[in-house]
Amino acid sequence: MGAELFYPLLASIIGLLMAGTPLMAQLIGRKERENLPFIVRSGMVIGLSVWALFTAAYFFFIDDLLASLALEAAVEHIARYYLMTMIGVVFFLSLMIPLRCLTDTAGSTSISMKLFLMAPVINGIFNYLFIYGHGGMPALGGIGAGLATMMTYGFLLGLFLLVVMKSKDLGGRQIFSSLALRSKDLREYLVVGVPSGLSIFMEMSLFSLIIVFLSRYGTDALAAYQIADNFASLVYMLPVSCSMALTILIATAVGAGDMTLARRYKKAGFVVAMGGAMMTASFTVLFRNSIGSVYTDDAAVAFIAGQFLIYSAGWQLFDAISTPIQGILRGLKDTRISFVLMVLAYWGGCFPMSLFLDSHTALGADSFWLGLDFGVGCSAFLMILRLLYVERKLDGRPMPSLSWLLTLIPGRKTAPAAVYAISLQRNIKKAEELLDLWTAMEEKLSMLMQKIKESEVDIYEALGSILPIRLSLLTDLHLSIIGHASRAYIP
């Protein structure tokens, strides 16, 4: 119970502090490595501020929170002290994540990979000691699990500090030789990090809320949901890895002013993410029953989980689009609009669709999985639109023309000049003026054609007979519309 309450908050804090990655990568691209210590210190200060808020919130609100959950006395005791150990977890994370951003960008992602591969072993040893009470330690049960997690993160922080201080490339001594901060670094860290952290929190809270609605379909449906969700989260690590790599690579290329290289990284990231998603989605669908059997011996739960895994295959394909784009946008330090789009996709698309299908169809628990697929699909679509907009803005290219909307005005017809004015100049007033001119010219041309028909003159007979028409009407018309005269428009 304590873990369920804490993990959405923990993921949000990590998302906030990982904003250091694009900031540091762009500095490296601009060859301004001397400014890296300011970013690291800014991240640590922000992290410690979050830790202080979390600590204060725990001591002020823990009693009311646990009372509102109406837990059994034994469960409440474990949850209370498990969450107390999480205070230490947040403290160690607040100092460790900025250092990880530094090693990932200024060093190599293999550094953090090697250190985090040690975490399960370390955590297993601490769990053995504190959960079951071996080696002279008290058997603390669930509280021991929290204590083991806290000590594991403390051990990892020590390893990161050791690596940073020993490496000349990472400049560890410069980081801790001064406490100087710059307000612009703090502000930029928050501008990039807060939307990232909030988007993670909103997404994880939605998934947690869906469990509440699924509870009325019985324990089998809940267990099957957790199986499918756990496997989908495991597979999700592939697009997340691509996203993190793209953040570093794109930010470094943009910092160096090499947009061509940034586009190459973007294409490579999509190829890897989509290729991996197609393989994992195919594997999920083909072996869905076997996957469920790995998690449980209950045939009914495994069967339901197999059905849910089909929907999770849809997630994988959509995530292979939206997640890398989020990494690209973070590399460009564009996170605020992405956060709004994520909220719209999940809380404005996924959640209402899930409730609608649940109340208006007989799909049962499948309603929420279809809603989740719809939400992730909306997220992918909106992320594509945002990326296209940001790319055009960086290139100085105009946005796609919306001049076709003028055709919806009653009695109006669009014209080349109006298209040109809107798409290139964004001058709506000029477009309206040219539309008026176009309408007037059409009326004059219609009257002229009517007179020609009445006089039964063949205007195709000789060039001389139509020369006055060209000079008096058509040339002026074409000059107004396309900027030069052309015989192609002569009737």
What function would you assign to each model-found segment?
Residues 1, 66-73, 129-140, 201-234, ...:
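Helix-terminus/linker motif at the lipid-water interface of multi-pass membrane proteins
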Residues 1-56, 93-112, 211, 224-288, ...:
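Small-residue-rich hydrophobic transmembrane alpha-helices
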Residues 14-17, 86-104, 112-123, 145-161, ...:
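Short runs within selected transmembrane alpha-helices of multi-pass transporters and secretion channels
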Residues 22, 63-64, 128, 196, ...:
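Transmembrane alpha-helix boundary and packing residues in multipass membrane permease domains
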Residues 24-91, 137-194, 250-315, 357-423, ...:
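Short alpha-helical transmembrane segments in multi-pass integral membrane proteins
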Residues 85, 89, 96, 119, ...:
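Transmembrane helical elements of multi-pass membrane transporters/channels
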Residues 416-417, 431-434, 439-440, 454-457, ...:
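Positively charged N-terminal leader segments that act as targeting/secretion signals
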